[in-house]
Amino acid sequence: MTASKDRENFVYIAKLAEQAERYEEMVESMKNVANLDVELTVEERNLLSVGYKNVIGARRASWRILSSIEQKEETKGNELNAKRIKEYRQKVELELSNICNDVMRVIDEHLIPSAAAGESTVFYYKMKGDYYRYLAEFKSGNEKKEAADQSMKAYESATAAAEADLPPTHPIRLGLALNFSVFYYEILNSPERACHLAKQAFDEAISELDTLNEESYKDSTLIMQLLRDNLTLWTSDIPEDGEDAQKVNGTAKLGGGEDAE
């Protein structure tokens, strides 16, 4: 089978797997495409992203539920149950780590080296920022700091590329601003910086809304709505003296904002 036939086959299987909600297989199929070291089409890029988003999303939801139950058991003083939950939670954390590390490897070894400047580059650096952010959600100590630093670096690279190559109304640029602001709010506990970034992205897009083509109008306005929802939610968290709020009792906020695909 030729490389182009292989590619066609992998993409078709990935679409089938998505329909069947078999996201691990969807990811495997799209990793096969990435391994060909070719520039992915928009459709292929989205298939890869959706597959990974579902694979990681299920574990992130599990982790949040387990953390919440663990907290309740600790509050009640049920040490044995808390210990059981902790062990189970750590199993989920290992899965999360493996998925995130897998994403980074595919991005660094195949996707970024094969990407053209512009949209693709922004997309992959944003994706890298997202998956380091997911690591920072559950890591602690130096590992958390390292994941947060890497996430920041990736988001900054994505932002520099987006500002150079994409208009403020572009859905990928808006999605990047949305997720980067969630990073500031949830990981760095900086509601003020989160709001500044979200508001700037929203205002810049509003001023150029009339330039939006019909194709991306729906996507862009949906993300703008999420930016506005998060701004409303976060503004109440900014202390009156203007300083960023620190973590309450050292615990990170869970589910502090909406993020994009």
Curated annotation (Swiss-Prot):
Q: Which family does it belong to?
A: Belongs to the 14-3-3 family.
Gene that produces this protein: GF14D
Q: InterPro entries this protein is in? A: 14-3-3, 14-3-3_CS, 14-3-3_dom_sf, 14-3-3_domain
The name this protein carries in UniProt is: 14-3-3-like protein D
Q: Where is this region: Disordered?
A: 238-261
Set out the biological process GO terms recorded for this chain's protein.
Answer: protein localization; signal transduction
- Entry GO terms, CC: cytoplasm
Pfam families attached to this UniProt entry: 14-3-3 (PF00244)
